[in-house]
Amino acid sequence: MHQYLSGLDAVASVRVEVHPEFSEPDRWTVDVRLKDDPSAESVATVVRDAYAKVLNLTGANEVRMVVSWVKGKTSVFCYLPMKDADKAASATVEALSPGMERVQIEEERISFEYRTTETLPDHFILPPSSAVLRLGSLRVEQSILIGRSHCFISHAKGKDLTSVPVKRALETIPSDKRYGAVLSLEAEDYNSHQARLIFKKWVNDWQDEDVQADAAVLATVLGNQVLQRVELLTSVESKVQPRVVGFDMKSGTVVGQGDPPEKGAPILAAAQQPDASS
């Protein structure tokens, strides 16, 4: 097996480990590192053909195999087995951009982790035309640290998130609320399959809670036609459960006063002021 893998043109190095089991089949772990800057075609060929050959050579039902490579300054890891691995790997190579630090292709998702920066790059959100979003069978996620705040994007096939003003929302967060803040945009949330924006901030005490940060974020997305829900979370370090204020949206307009309304109404009123997101 080592000889076969090492003989492939695109392969730089191979490591094979066998873990004997007393009453079960032996467990095989295979790490394959490709030569730098491989083409999409060569990656797809190794991922598809090499895994099938390794299964044949070991006689095992399953082999844990990791194919890794570096493209520019981006490290990519493909974990096998997975369905349509060659298509996923090929599409990922096409989607790579210089700002990406680490990319992982796994059984159910492709995750793109970006280098820390002070401002969100323009056109950060992957468009529906991206090869990875046309796959359909895998979740596609993007994550980046913007200064002291985290930003996550979770995609779904057929959902275009590019119109959601995530960059503007991040920039409107008051400086004293940016440390540890999280802004998450989901094409489909787990329960209701709605396009949802979640903003989470930290306060030292519930007494420090104010509507300014929440209103600023909400104001940036008023009028957006894609979002169906906005959730604003506030956490105190000593408390396990954050406080949540939710807003359902339809055609860019908030429906009702928020949930709970006694918390939502003042946030919505502040968000609707002309200078709320500036």
Which residue stretches match the model-derived regions?
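Structural beta->alpha junctions
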Residues: 35-39
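Extracytoplasmic/luminal low-complexity segments enriched in Pro/Gly and acidic/polar residues
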Residues: 160-278
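Short loop/turn motifs enriched for small/polar and acidic residues
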Residues: 19, 66-72, 233-235
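Long, acidic/polar, low-complexity amphipathic helices and coiled-coil-like
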Residues: 25-30, 40-156
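Short secondary-structure junctions
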Residues: 6-14, 58-59, 96-98, 174-180, ...
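Short edge beta-strands and adjacent turn/loop segments
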Residues: 8-32, 103-111, 176-199
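C-terminal region of N-terminal signal peptides and the immediate post-cleavage residues
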Residues: 1-4
